[in-house]
Structures are given as structure tokens and as C-alpha cells.
């Protein structure tokens, strides 16, 4: 009799939970329509993989790319709609969140054709790779729209778990296994630190988890200037710092960049920073509204350390991927300037604009590295000597992307940095902007050093890797060149195109 009653209660409780979930999905599902498209694409990938053979492999790429393009289209159709909060306050939809989601989808869309030839040459499992990329993209999109502490923790974990699996995808490579181990251990530690910071914020606000309600709770409890908030700020900054990888939270970055498959590095190098930047702007700007001076100081220290250490250490690197790892540490220092400036002086707009250009510059560089690595099997900077004599298109593409990363006019990187530094100067961040300008000059040095090697014509400097360089006979070579061309064109956008981009970015402010 007791068992019968307990069984009935279990059925009733399960029914209520199911009905509540169905109600939320029915009435709030339209707010996550782009995410639902990706979920449908994931299900379709699994179904095709379980019922198909090797001949259907092109369909896997087609479904993945189509899902991403359709998700981008859904986002664009929803542009300029009124901000909405859905799923009982867990998710917020507005232009600011959506432009970061657009950037993440753009990264993933460009990374899939970039990966095709690499997957074929290394004979990696295709379906699992695409599943991890789409799932990580989904986690990044949910993080951009997260409106409560639980979602802000769960969404990046979804992204991080896929990142760990992708970084160790080449299981037979010792460097890949080492990179995954370091990435996993440090990622787990940073997640613990982040949750600890959330617990202080939760307790200080009187048990609130929604971002805006936390602010109201801090006002009601008079805890907005308490030591607990300072402790929460420090722990949350450290936790988010792992995702952004500024110095001194950068230790994992060079090893993961060097040991992971190159298409994976290309994907992680941009998507993780875009998602973490979206989360950081909302966390610092809303719950820590009353502690703006404190978090400004913390971020200024991180930006200075990142710009100086990242660019100085990059000079000494001999591996192309390790050089880009330290370069990315310096680049995130520039992005942090936009976060500090905020929306009062166009800081967020300049940050979004620069990240858009950074995506094209960085992915274009990695597309060139993937192409060169597959034909030579090397990642050493010295082995790029004389590439112009064998493959002028690849050498010129790499040179343009590197020059744009360095910020030389009239390339896109120059105008992105110019607008970012100008906003910082207007906000009174004179010392920070001065450091940014000096370190940009340093970065130009090591980029030009690589370009000089690319264009050298002296036989004694050309290594056997370039002397024996052969173009790939694979048809998929067209896909990597497609990504490369798109990124190179975007990296060379002249300043005349800056105004409409900045105007669109300005519309994304809160």
C-alpha cells in the first residue's frame, strides 16, 4: 500500500515537471530559436551517422554548416526586437547578447571548412568532431544570454567540456594529451573558484541568483560595499580570467595552442574569448555596479600585464602556434580596455568592432597555418622561410593577416585598435592606452620578422620543408581556401567601412 502511494506520487511529480518543462518550451522556445536550430542539427548529425556509410560524409559537413548559417539568419531576423527575459528569468534576449552570439556563430561557420582537409589527412572521427564544435557553440550562445548565476556557470561548462575533448582529439599525440590534462585541471580549478565567488554574491544579496535581482538584493541588505562583495569580485575575476586568458591566468594557453589540433586551436582562440567577454561585461556591469572602481582597477592590472607579457614573450617563440598564443594574450589586453570603458564612451562598441576584426585576422592566420602544416608537417617559424617562392597566395594571405594583427594601416586591425584606443583615451585611461600603443609596436616587430622569412629568396635560408613543398591534391583544399579568402578580405577592410560597423555596434548597448 505504501509503495503504491509512493509510486503514484512519483508519477504525479514527474508529470508536473514534464508539463512545466513543456510549458516553458512552448511559450519561451521562440526566444531561443537560433539555439533550437543548432540542437536540431545535432540530432540530425547523430541520426545520419548511425544510419550512413562513408559516402555520406559530405552530408555531415553540409548539415553542420547549414545549421550554423540558419541560426545566424534567425538571429538577424530577430534584430532590433524589444529585450525579453524568458525561462523564468534564466535567459535574456537583447541586441547586446545577440551580437556576441552572432560572433560565436560566425567563428564556428568559418572553422568548419577550415577543418575539412585536416580531418581527412589525419583520419580523425568526423561526426564526433562536428558534434563537439556545435555543442561548444551552443554553450557559448547560452552563456551570452545567461541572466542568472546558475546558467552563467552551466553554459561555460558545456563549452569547456567540449573544449577539453577537442583539445585531446588526437589521442596518439603525446603533446595533445599533455595539453588536455593541463587544460582540464586548470579549467576545473577555475570553475571551482568561479562558483566560490558566486556563493559570496548569492549570500550577500540575500539569496538572489538573477543579475538584476542581485543588485536589488544588495541594496536591500546594504551589503553592496561589504568585504564579501570584494571577495566575490576577486574570485569571479579569477574564474572568468581563465576563459579570457589574460596574464597571469594564461599558463594553459601556450601549451594548449601548441598541443591541440590546429583547427581546434583556431576555434578555441576566438569563441572562448567572445563568450567570456560577453559574460564579463554583464557580470561586472550589473551585479558589481557599486564596485566599479574596484573592478576597473583589477581589469587595468590584468590588461597591463597581458599587453606587456604577451607581446614580449611572443618575440622569443619558435613555434608559430605558441607565438599566436602569446599574441592572443596581448590581444585580450586590448579588448579589456573596451570592457573598462563601458558604454559611456563607446567602449563596448569599440570592443565588439575589434573582436569582429580579430576573428577574421586570427582565423585567417590559422587557416594559413593549417594549410602549411598539412603540406610540410612542421610548425616551426624558421621553416616558413621562402614560402613565397612556392605558394605566393598562401604567403601573401598569411602576411596580410599578420600585418592586420599588428595594426598596420590601412588594414582592419589598425582601425579597430585606433577606435579602441581613442575610446580609452576619451575615458581618461591615458596610461593604459600608452601601454597599448607601445606593445602594439612590439607586436609589429615579431610579425614583420615572420613576413621577412616568408618573402626571402635566398636558397641558403630556405629549409627542406619549403623546398619539398607540394600543393594538396585533395578536393577539400577548396574549403580551406574559402575560409582563408573570406578572412583575408575581412582583415583588409579599409577605414571607409568602419562607420557602419561602429553604428551597428552602438545599437547593441544596454
Swiss-Prot record:
UniProt keyword annotations, A-Z: Chloroplast, Membrane, NAD, NADP, Plastid, Plastoquinone, Quinone, Thylakoid, Translocase, Transmembrane, Transmembrane helix, Transport
Subcellular location: Plastid, Chloroplast thylakoid membrane
A Gene Ontology cellular-component term: chloroplast thylakoid membrane
EC number in record: 7.1.1.-
Record-linked Pfam families: Ndh2_N, Proton_antipo_M
Principal location class: plastid
TM helices/strands, residue ranges: 24-44, 57-77, 99-119, 124-144, 149-169, 183-203, 227-247, 295-315, 323-343, 354-374, 392-412, 418-438, 482-502
Catalytic activity, reaction form: a plastoquinone + NADH + (n+1) H(+)(in) = a plastoquinol + NAD(+) + n H(+)(out); a plastoquinone + NADPH + (n+1) H(+)(in) = a plastoquinol + NADP(+) + n H(+)(out)
GO biological process: ATP synthesis coupled electron transport; photosynthesis, light reaction
Membrane topology: Multi-pass membrane protein
Domain of life of the source: Eukaryota
Similarity section: Belongs to the complex I subunit 2 family.
Assembly behavior: NDH is composed of at least 16 different subunits, 5 of which are encoded in the nucleus.
Function: NDH shuttles electrons from NAD(P)H:plastoquinone, via FMN and iron-sulfur (Fe-S) centers, to quinones in the photosynthetic chain and possibly in a chloroplast respiratory chain. The immediate electron acceptor for the enzyme in this species is believed to be plastoquinone. Couples the redox reaction to proton translocation, and thus conserves the redox energy in a proton gradient.
Protein name listed in UniProt: NAD(P)H-quinone oxidoreductase subunit 2 A, chloroplastic
Amino acid at each position: 500500500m505504501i509503495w503504491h502511494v509512493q509510486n503514484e506520487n512519483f508519477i504525479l511529480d514527474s508529470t508536473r515537471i514534464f508539463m512545466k518543462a513543456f510549458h516553458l518550451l512552448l511559450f519561451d522556445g521562440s526566444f531561443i530559436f537560433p539555439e533550437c536550430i543548432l540542437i536540431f542539427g545535432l540530432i540530425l548529425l547523430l541520426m545520419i551517422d548511425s544510419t550512413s556509410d562513408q559516402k555520406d560524409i559530405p552530408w555531415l559537413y553540409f548539415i553542420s554548416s547549414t545549421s550554423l548559417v540558419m541560426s545566424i539568419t534567425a538571429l538577424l531576423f530577430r534584430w532590433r526586437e524589444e529585450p525579453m527575459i524568458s525561462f523564468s528569468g534564466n535567459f535574456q534576449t537583447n541586441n547586446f547578447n545577440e551580437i556576441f552570439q552572432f560572433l560565436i556563430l560566425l567563428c564556428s561557420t568559418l572553422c568548419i571548412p577550415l577543418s575539412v582537409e585536416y580531418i581527412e589527412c589525419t583520419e580523425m572521427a568526423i561526426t564526433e568532431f562536428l558534434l563537439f564544435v556545435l555543442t561548444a557553440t551552443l554553450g557559448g550562445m547560452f552563456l551570452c544570454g545567461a541572466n542568472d548565476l546558475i546558467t552563467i556557470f552551466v553554459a561555460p561548462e558545456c563549452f569547456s567540456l567540449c573544449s577539453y575533448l577537442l583539445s585531446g582529439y588526437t589521442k596518439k599525440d603525446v603533446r595533445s594529451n599533455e595539453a588536455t590534462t593541463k587544460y582540464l585541471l586548470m579549467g576545473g580549478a577555475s570553475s571551482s573558484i568561479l562558483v566560490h565567488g558566486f556563493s559570496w554574491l548569492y549570500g550577500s544579496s540575500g539569496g538572489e541568483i538573477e543579475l538584476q535581482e542581485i543588485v536589488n538584493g544588495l541594496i536591500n541588505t546594504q551589503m553592496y560595499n561589504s568585504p564579501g562583495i570584494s571577495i566575490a569580485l576577486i574570485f569571479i575575476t579569477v574564474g572568468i580570467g581563465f576563459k579570457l586568458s589574460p596574464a597571469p591566468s594564461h599558463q594553459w594557453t601556450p601549451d594548449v595552442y601548441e598541443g591541440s589540433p590546429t583547427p581546434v586551436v583556431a576555434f578555441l582562440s576566438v569563441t572562448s574569448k567572445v563568450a567570456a567577454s560577453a559574460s564579463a561585461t554583464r557580470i561586472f556591469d550589473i551585479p558589481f555596479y557599486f564596485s566599479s572602481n574596484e573592478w576597473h582597477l583589477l581589469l587595468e592590472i590584468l590588461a597591463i600585464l597581458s599587453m606587456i607579457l604577451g607581446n614580449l614573450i611572443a618575440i622569443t617563440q619558435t613555434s608559430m602556434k605558441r607565438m599566436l598564443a602569446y599574441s592572443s594574450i596581448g590581444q585580450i589586453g586590448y579588448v579589456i580596455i573596451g570592457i573598462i570603458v563601458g558604454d559611456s564612451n563607446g567602449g563596448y562598441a569599440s570592443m565588439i568592432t575589434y573582436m569582429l576584426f580579430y576573428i577574421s585576422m586570427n582565423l585567417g592566420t590559422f587557416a594559413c597555418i593549417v594549410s602549411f602544416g598539412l603540406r610540410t608537417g612542421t610548425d616551426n617559424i624558421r621553416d616558413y622561410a621562402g614560402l613565397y617562392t612556392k605558394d605566393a597566395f598562401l604567403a601573401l594571405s598569411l602576411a596580410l593577416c599578420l600585418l592586420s594583427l599588428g595594426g598596420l594601416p590601412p588594414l582592419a586591425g589598425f582601425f579597430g585598435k585606433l577606435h579602441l584606443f581613442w575610446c580609452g583615451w576619451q575615458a581618461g585611461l591615458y596610461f593604459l592606452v600608452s601601454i597599448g600603443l607601445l606593445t602594439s609596436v612590439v607586436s609589429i616587430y615579431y610579425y614583420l620578422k615572420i613576413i621577412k622569412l616568408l618573402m626571402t629568396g635566398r636558397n641558403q635560408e630556405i629549409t627542406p620543408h619549403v623546398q619539398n613543398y607540394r600543393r594538396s591534391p585533395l578536393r577539400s583544399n577548396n574549403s580551406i581556401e574559402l575560409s582563408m579568402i573570406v578572412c583575408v578580405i575581412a582583415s583588409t577592410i579599409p577605414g571607409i567601412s568602419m562607420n557602419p560597423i561602429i553604428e551597428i555596434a552602438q545599437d547593441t548597448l544596454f
